[in-house]
């Protein structure tokens, strides 16, 4: 009903949403939907990719559940607090950190992996001006 008490004369009008293109050949509407991000639409390239990305997280969960079953709730809570404390301690932003204490807590200090050989700090891709990097980290820039 409109202000005069009469119904709309355009009963068979088409809504605006149906006027937009749809289907496999639809063009992306930047004004209504914003920029499209291809990264979110991609599927993992290999079935093992997701497993490899979450390997350390799954390993930690398994270790914590085993530790909880053996020693109770205190042991995994203590280890998780130590993990948080160790992850917060870092070097200056322009220096690479090996995070040796985190490796010791996880038990990775006795193993040799490809990251031990191929992760040479002198060949790092991220080399910047030390003063600028510290100022950025402290929020001065």
Curated annotation (Swiss-Prot):
<feature type="short sequence motif" description="High-affinity association with the preproteasome">
    <location>
        <begin position="68"/>
        <end position="72"/>
    </location>
</feature>
<dbReference type="Pfam" id="PF05348">
    <property type="entry name" value="UMP1"/>
</dbReference>
<feature type="cross-link" description="Glycyl lysine isopeptide (Lys-Gly) (interchain with G-Cter in SUMO2)">
    <location>
        <position position="39"/>
    </location>
</feature>
<keyword id="KW-0977">Ichthyosis</keyword>
<keyword id="KW-0143">Chaperone</keyword>
<dbReference type="GO" id="GO:0043248">
    <property type="term" value="P:proteasome assembly"/>
</dbReference>
<dbReference type="GO" id="GO:0016020">
    <property type="term" value="C:membrane"/>
</dbReference>
<keyword id="KW-0832">Ubl conjugation</keyword>
<dbReference type="GO" id="GO:0005783">
    <property type="term" value="C:endoplasmic reticulum"/>
</dbReference>
<keyword id="KW-1007">Palmoplantar keratoderma</keyword>
<keyword id="KW-0963">Cytoplasm</keyword>
<comment type="subunit">
    <text>Constituent of preproteasomes, but not of mature 20S proteasomes. Within the preproteasome, may directly interact with PSMB1/beta6, PSMB4/beta7, PSMB5/beta5, PSMB6/beta1 and PSMB9/beta1i. Interaction with PSMB8/beta5i has been observed in PubMed:10973495, but not in PubMed:10926487. Forms tetramers.</text>
</comment>
<dbReference type="GO" id="GO:0016607">
    <property type="term" value="C:nuclear speck"/>
</dbReference>
<comment type="similarity">
    <text>Belongs to the POMP/UMP1 family.</text>
</comment>
<keyword id="KW-0472">Membrane</keyword>
<keyword id="KW-0256">Endoplasmic reticulum</keyword>
<keyword id="KW-0492">Microsome</keyword>
<comment type="function">
    <text>Molecular chaperone essential for the assembly of standard proteasomes and immunoproteasomes. Degraded after completion of proteasome maturation. Mediates the association of 20S preproteasome with the endoplasmic reticulum.</text>
</comment>
<keyword id="KW-1017">Isopeptide bond</keyword>
<keyword id="KW-0539">Nucleus</keyword>
<dbReference type="GO" id="GO:0005829">
    <property type="term" value="C:cytosol"/>
</dbReference>
<dbReference type="InterPro" id="IPR008012">
    <property type="entry name" value="Ump1"/>
</dbReference>
<dbReference type="GO" id="GO:0005737">
    <property type="term" value="C:cytoplasm"/>
</dbReference>
<dbReference type="GO" id="GO:0005634">
    <property type="term" value="C:nucleus"/>
</dbReference>
<protein>
    <recommendedName>
        <fullName>Proteasome maturation protein</fullName>
    </recommendedName>
</protein>
């Amino acid at each position: 009903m409109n202000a005069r008490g009469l119904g709309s004369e355009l009963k068979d009008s088409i809504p605006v949403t149906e006027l937009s293109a749809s289907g496999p050949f639809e063009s992306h509407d930047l004004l209504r939907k914003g920029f499209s991000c291809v990264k979110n639409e991609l599927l993992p390239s290999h079935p093992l990719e997701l497993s490899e990305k979450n390997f350390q997280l799954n390993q930690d969960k398994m270790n914590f559940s085993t530790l909880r079953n053996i020693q109770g709730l205190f042991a995994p809570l203590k280890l998780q607090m130590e993990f948080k404390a160790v992850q917060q301690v870092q070097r200056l932003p322009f220096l690479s950190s090996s995070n040796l204490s985190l490796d010791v807590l996880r038990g990775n200090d006795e193993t040799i992996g490809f990251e031990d050989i191929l992760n040479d700090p002198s060949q790092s891709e991220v080399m910047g001006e030390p003063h600028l990097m510290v100022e950025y980290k402290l929020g001065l820039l």
